[in-house]
Amino acid sequence: MMHFKSGLELTELQNMTVPEDDNVSNDSNDFTEVENGQINSKFISDRESRRSLTNSHLEKRKCDEYIPGTTSLGMSVFNLSNAIMGSGILGLAFALANTGILLFLILLTSVTLLSIYSINLLLICSKETGCMVYEKLGEQVFGTTGKLVIFGATSLQNTGAMLSYLFIVKNELPSAIKSLMGEEETFSAWYVDGRVLVVMVTFGIILPLCLLKNLGYLGYTSGFSLSCMVFFLIVVIYKKFQIPCMNGEQNSTVSANVTDACTPKYVTFNSKTVYALPTIAFAFVCHPSVLPIYSELKDRSQKKMQMVSNISFFAMFVMYFLTAIFGYLTFYEKVQSDLLHKYQSTGDILILTVRLAVIVAVILTVPVLFFTVRSSLFELAKKTKFHLCRHVLVTIILLVIINLLVIFIPSMKDIFGVVGVTSANMLIFILPSSLYLKITNQDGDKNTQRIWAALFLALGVLFSLISIPLVIYDWACSSSNGEGH
């Protein structure tokens, strides 16, 4: 993660612009926190230790080497909220329906608090090393392996977000077109086939945007994306009081079960319960954007950035819970992994408007995430100098692969499940705790904190060991039963 999980602050836009030279210095991304004229770091690289450690020296640096933050606390909260908000919000009602209200609330609260703790670990690591970029931090602590692991986790997370956004186009655009044509949902034709439409949108709109050399104003669409999701939440709450339970589906055969079907469940276990935790984790990933936002924060300090994360996560917690609970109380066990798809827009201008707004938002957000993934690949291959043929070829190949995955993936819960138990788990649990334990392994004063970090790491490993086999088992059962999972 709608990411809209992209956290589009200035630092990211600079990083996503393709550099002109092969040997590009990344020192502009290495900020150093200074307290009383000295760097507070016990894990500083040899290269940096040879530099003068005084404020006067820092003031003499070039602007691209040390840039004081200029973003206010309020705008930083907005930026981090943008980074947190993603397509995961559409799957939370489905997660609630398969866990029950009480269990879902426990899971949502737990992931929120654990995510805040992981950001605290990340900020401590940044302060100790002087690194303000996640990949640089991994490289300094674990060498090339650390850099590759973080690049891989971040790229997988962004790819998962792109898949979920294009899946929304595949699901929602046919309904929107049918509504605009005045046709019923049962209407079928090649031009309202989601698979055809997602390919047309990808190569007609997204491909030209992805071929641009830099993002330009496209990078500022995250504000629009967040606004769309706030609008979606308002509509979900409003529609709860308009749509009757079972949505007119009850008849003489099922009337006896209507009361039970329209009664909220507080604790539920079934084969789909396994997707709840990965979906929630997917919805809260913002860690690649935390350090860039930190670097832009005015008068930055660890305490101030922690306040930014606390406010942002609390706001998203409220928004996520309201969306999940009202979506669930509208459709109960009939809710789908894409909540928006359950609403019928035929003859309903409000639903049609929110559907079109979300479609436009995700279409504009995909290129932003694509720039990040492609830039990461070029940097790993040390091919940072712009080359038109390579630029076009890599773009087309990646978009073809992504489209094939979108066409053949049965439902959004599969995206949430896979990305949630892999990259989201790595970015929230495993990487921050591993970095912290490595950095503080010589610090005897932090034994208590190290124990908590070790438990946090163990929790992430346990999450993977339990969730991955269960997701695979559900796929196997669904396939053997001839069901789409």
From Swiss-Prot:
It catalyses: L-glutamine(in) + Na(+)(in) = L-glutamine(out) + Na(+)(out); L-alanine(in) + Na(+)(in) = L-alanine(out) + Na(+)(out); L-asparagine(in) + Na(+)(in) = L-asparagine(out) + Na(+)(out); L-histidine(in) + Na(+)(in) = L-histidine(out) + Na(+)(out). Its main location: membrane. N-glycosylation plays an important role in the L-glutamine transport. The keyword Ribosomal protein does not apply. Induction: Up-regulated by forskolin in astrocytes. It comes from the Eukaryota. Residues 1-74, 134-148, 212-216, 295-310, 370-391, 436-450 are cytoplasmic. Specifically expressed in brain with the highest levels in cerebellum and thalamus (at protein level). Expressed in glutamatergic, GABAergic and a subset of dopaminergic neurons of the substantia nigra and cholinergic motoneurons (at protein level). Also expressed by ependymal cells lining the ventricle (at protein level). Expression is also detected in spinal cord, heart, colon and placenta. The modification Phosphothreonine is found at residues 11, 54. The modification Phosphoserine is found at residues 6, 25, 28, 49, 52, 56. One of its GO terms (molecular function) is L-glutamine transmembrane transporter activity. Glycans are attached at residues 251, 257. One of its GO terms (biological process) is L-glutamine import across plasma membrane. The chain crosses the membrane at residues 75-97, 113-133, 149-169, 189-211, 217-237, 274-294, 311-331, 349-369, 392-412, 415-435, 451-471. Disulfide bonds join 245-262. Belongs to the amino acid/polyamine transporter 2 family. Symporter that cotransports short-chain neutral amino acids and sodium ions from the extraccellular to the intracellular side of the cell membrane. The transport is elctrogenic, pH dependent and driven by the Na(+) electrochemical gradient. Participates in the astroglia-derived glutamine transport into GABAergic interneurons for neurotransmitter GABA de novo synthesis. May also contributes to amino acid transport in placental trophoblast. Regulates synaptic plasticity. This is Sodium-coupled neutral amino acid symporter 1. It comes from Rattus norvegicus. The gene is Slc38a1.
